[in-house]
Amino acid sequence: MTTNIAAAGVQAGQDQAAPSPLVDFIKDFKCNRGAVIGLAVMVVVTLAALLAPWIAPHDPLLQDRDHMLTAPVWTSGQWTYILGTDEAGRDILSRLVFGARMSLLIGITSVLFALVPGVVLGLLAAFFPQKAGPLIMRLMDIMMALPSLLLAVAVMAVLGPGVLNAMIAIAIVTLPGYVRLTRASAMIELERDYVTASRMAGAGLLRLMFVAVLPNCMAPLLIHATLSFSNAILDIAALGFLGLGVQPPTPEWGTMLASARDYITSAWWVVTMPGLTILASVLSINLMGDGLRDALDPRLKRIS
């Protein structure tokens, strides 16, 4: 009787000492101060994008011809236009808030457009290394040999400007990274004993791919998706600056930069505000990606 009670006490102590993976992840993520700051900034940006119709002080398309190129409020401006106005008299703050909706939407959608086929192609390359693998990987090598922005511009030249085409172009540019990462992770997992046991138990190909192997490859994929999200925001801003992305007068950060490039010296705020917004968003997402890597990578945990 005493032995059973002691064993139960030891088991209870072990259960209390071993936190759940979610609790362990949150604890490790919170230890990275930069990641927490990046998460806070992106929460603010996301809330601003979702609540844009209610928190934006003005219509982003409304033109006030009497207040064109009005300076920000802290430099002899007025409180009606806190961050000033652009060359058409449109409120910069309102356009930044509404532009966040477009940038985040395109970023998230392009990541999903690249993630899903990238995972499928990567798994096919890992499970069929003699047949489909070489063909898929050589195609990815050719795509990676081209500069990403040049490839995106080439795709946009074929498809034409527009929001959907910009999403497709960015997804094509980021696709090889997902394929290579999925293939590498899956090939490591294929050597594990649990995969052999699943095969001996009669698991089919699809079950092996998406039930046995894929869940164990998600950690590096999530980290890569986070970093690709920041690259997607940069790419859509670059395409908008070149006139191939979101078309005026729709508010989008890159398009705002393109329309303001003639006023860099005379009205610095027209260029500085969207530029700082892009910088803060991309930096915050990269900090979040570093935090996810530190929290999800078991090798880094062993080193620490």
What are these regions (language model features)?
Residues M1-C31, L62-R90, S304:
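Membrane-topology segments of multi-pass transport proteins
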Residues M1-I5, T46, A238-L239:
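Short acidic (Asp/Glu) and glycine-rich catalytic loops that position anionic groups and cofactors
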Residues G13-L61, L139, C217-M218:
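N-terminal signal-anchor/first transmembrane alpha helix
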Residues D28, I55, I82-T85, Y263, ...:
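Residue-level signal for helical boundary/lining positions with a hydrophobic bias
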Residues G34, A52, W74, M187, ...:
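Residue-level marker of positions within ordered structural domains that often coincide
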Residues A40, A48-T85, L242-T250:
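Hydrophobic alpha-helical transmembrane segments of membrane transport/permease proteins
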Residues E87-S304:
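Alpha-helical transmembrane segments of integral membrane proteins
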